[in-house]
Amino acid sequence: MNAPFHQLADAILAGTPATPEDALAVLRADDAELMSVVAAAGRLRRAHFGNTVKVNYLVNLKSGLCPENCNYCSQALGSDAPILKYSWLSKDETLKQTGAGLRGGASRVCLVSSGRGPSTRDIDKVTEMVVALKEEYPGVEVCACLGLLKDGQAQRLKDAGVDAYNHNINTAESNHDNIVQTHTYADRVDTVEKAKGGGLSPCSGLIAGLGETDEQLVEALFALRELGSDSIPVNFLMPFDGTPFENTWELSPTRCVKILAMARFVCPDKEIRIAGGREMHLRSLQSIALQVANSVFLGDYLTSEGQDAKADLEMIRDNGFVVLGSEEDLAQQAREPIDPAIRQRGAGTDVVPNA
């Protein structure tokens, strides 16, 4: 294995971190080199995570009507996207929604609410939900995503049983003001630091396709490495109608795979999660992306529908991976026979052919 990307993997496995120049080389690799990039990044993935895939499940506790003006977001101030809008779910409804995801194979549930950040009453609501969740499902990991944190709130969440806190930096600091003006990049970093200071595992990632340059994608990833993010969700812009980014299509499936591979090279021992937008941007390369990423969201997202959960589990199994924490049970569930479909169209019939 003398290809440059395998040499880079060798160096990283030996303890030499990737440089920004290395990251740019991965991102700018020719499409003809894609499988070499994937194979090299896959060595890092398997060295740290074996053949497991961590499955996460989102529960949108409060949807829409956010006062922040993030240009990419269907829930943001000024968005006309025709999404579901509702106030806080009840504790019982939260338990019901969480149970569905856990039965589907998720080991981590992500409790998300729209808004700038939680009030004291909001923290009260969420901590009550988390205590009930932990009692009902003792082994579940809980990640909260409630916006910008105030002093002491991370500790309250930790004390209630929250394991991690998600707050994405979304893009490079040099691109931040182009996508949101109601809070600063420093505000986002401060919340990640507050989460860490409160004993929560930091979960912070990015969104690709926001008009950023290659250099800004690299800048964002190295910022996440510097922040010490344990879990890095890599989202791909979903250009909702009614938002400033509607009709924005800057990504190809091969570029998305390279972005994920770049994340693996830069942060080899961190959870790299294929997050929002994977279905519309990776398309038929979703399974290839699993060779470098080790985590996915199951089912639907906050305001958009995702791939069928059964298809997600089949994709994991078909690629030789197992769901973290549910290796045996889910492997058997996914092994349902598929009978051949008898042709009833095209030649020899009056039915339009499949062409």
Swiss-Prot record:
Q: Which SUPFAM superfamilies match?
A: Radical SAM enzymes (SSF102114)
The molecular function terms in GO held by this entry are: 2 iron, 2 sulfur cluster binding; 4 iron, 4 sulfur cluster binding; biotin synthase activity; iron ion binding
**Radical SAM core domain span:** 51-275
Q: Which SMART domains match?
A: BATS, Elp3
One Pfam match, given by its short name, reads BATS
The UniProt record lists the EC number as: 2.8.1.6
| Cofactor(s) this protein requires | [4Fe-4S] cluster; [2Fe-2S] cluster
Q: What does the note accompanying the cofactor annotation read?
A: Binds 1 [4Fe-4S] cluster. The cluster is coordinated with 3 cysteines and an exchangeable S-adenosyl-L-methionine.
Question: Could you tell me which CDD domains the record lists for this protein?
Answer: Radical_SAM
Gene Ontology biological-process annotations: biotin biosynthetic process
PROSITE patterns on file: RADICAL_SAM
- Catalysed reactions, semicolon-separated: (4R,5S)-dethiobiotin + (sulfur carrier)-SH + 2 reduced [2Fe-2S]-[ferredoxin] + 2 S-adenosyl-L-methionine = (sulfur carrier)-H + biotin + 2 5'-deoxyadenosine + 2 L-methionine + 2 oxidized [2Fe-2S]-[ferredoxin]
Record pathway: Cofactor biosynthesis; biotin biosynthesis; biotin from 7,8-diaminononanoate: step 2/2
InterPro entries per the UniProt record, alphabetical = Aldolase_TIM, BATS_dom, Biotin_synth/BioAB, Biotin_synthase, Elp3/MiaA/NifB-like_rSAM, rSAM
Q: Which domain of life is it from?
A: Bacteria
The record, for HAMAP family, names:
BioB
Oligomeric state and interaction partners are given as:
Homodimer.
What does this gene product do? Catalyzes the conversion of dethiobiotin (DTB) to biotin by the insertion of a sulfur atom into dethiobiotin via a radical-based mechanism.
State the family it belongs to: Belongs to the radical SAM superfamily. Biotin synthase family.
What is the recorded name of this protein? Answer: Biotin synthase
Organism (species): Saccharopolyspora erythraea (strain ATCC 11635 / DSM 40517 / JCM 4748 / NBRC 13426 / NCIMB 8594 / NRRL 2338)
